[in-house]
Amino acid sequence: MESITISQLKNWKRNKKKIAAITAYDFSFSRLFSNCGIPVILIGDSLGMTIQGHTSTLPVKIEDIAYHTKAVRKGAPNTFLISDLPFMSYYDTKQALKNTAKIIRSGANMIKMEGGKWLIEIIRELSNRLILICGHIGLIPQSFHYLGGYKVQGRKENDANKLIDEALLLEEAGINMLILECIPEKLAKKITESLSIPVIGIGSGKNTDGQILVMHDLLGITEGKTPSFTKNFLSESDSIQKAIQKYIYEVEHSIYPSKKHSF
């Protein structure tokens, strides 16, 4: 697979080619995903739960993300890598610049930050320094205490309008991609059509420019109850490789997510 670039991903949006993304945290799985044709991998702070055994993403540190980014880059040299900036690692511009540099040096193509209007000035500073940025709005796990838990966001008209405004402001400030998590399908469609950058959904319906899932959910190895928007692709396949290929196919052909995976 040739190296995936942000220019290609923007072309995919224009050409209505769906983007199938997944999380990964190590060499072996990232190599497998890359060989299957996954174009985008997120080194997510979800590793706090899936790898470290915490009950949330909050304990994850920048050093953890850097370590796992290096491992994933070795396994997926040509895949487009997005790495999370974890909780309280970008509370001001100076800290955001310092930690972004650490993550980019570790092999990421792009960094991801959760939040809305309060991030605008930080995003502008990073964008002015030609850093690729992925925004993340809707359900933002780093703020689950404030949100009252892991709940669908944007159901009420005022909340929906706020998310639309935030998406537009983030794009104007300089983000190059946006993740929408756990918002109603119609709202996600409206936001996706309003932006010129790729919009990736998780629990936000099929009308975004692509989908992302936590690998443990996709493979059915998550402990306990999984979110209703996830699908166990391994249960319908006889190997991990075929499960990943099925995921890619279903995303690219708008089979997944179906209505039962949407809000």
Swiss-Prot record:
EC number: 2.1.2.11
UniProt KW keywords: Cytoplasm, Magnesium, Metal-binding, Pantothenate biosynthesis, Transferase
Gene, per the UniProt record: panB
Name of the protein this chain belongs to: 3-methyl-2-oxobutanoate hydroxymethyltransferase
Entry-linked InterPro entries: Pantoate_hydroxy_MeTrfase, Pyrv/PenolPyrv_kinase-like_dom, Pyrv_kinase-like_dom_sf
Enzyme class (EC, first level): transferase
HAMAP family: PanB (MF_00156)
Pathway terms, separated by semicolons: Cofactor biosynthesis; (R)-pantothenate biosynthesis; (R)-pantoate from 3-methyl-2-oxobutanoate: step 1/2
Locations listed in the record: Cytoplasm
Domain of life of the organism encoding this protein: Bacteria
GO biological process: pantothenate biosynthetic process
GO molecular function: 3-methyl-2-oxobutanoate hydroxymethyltransferase activity; magnesium ion binding
Reaction(s) catalysed by this chain's protein: 3-methyl-2-oxobutanoate + (6R)-5,10-methylene-5,6,7,8-tetrahydrofolate + H2O = 2-dehydropantoate + (6S)-5,6,7,8-tetrahydrofolate
GO terms under cellular component: cytoplasm
Sites where the protein binds Mg(2+): 45, 84, 114
Matching Pfam families: Pantoate_transf
Cofactor note: Binds 1 Mg(2+) ion per subunit.
Main location: cytoplasm
UniProt cofactor(s): Mg(2+)
Keyword Cytoplasm applies: yes
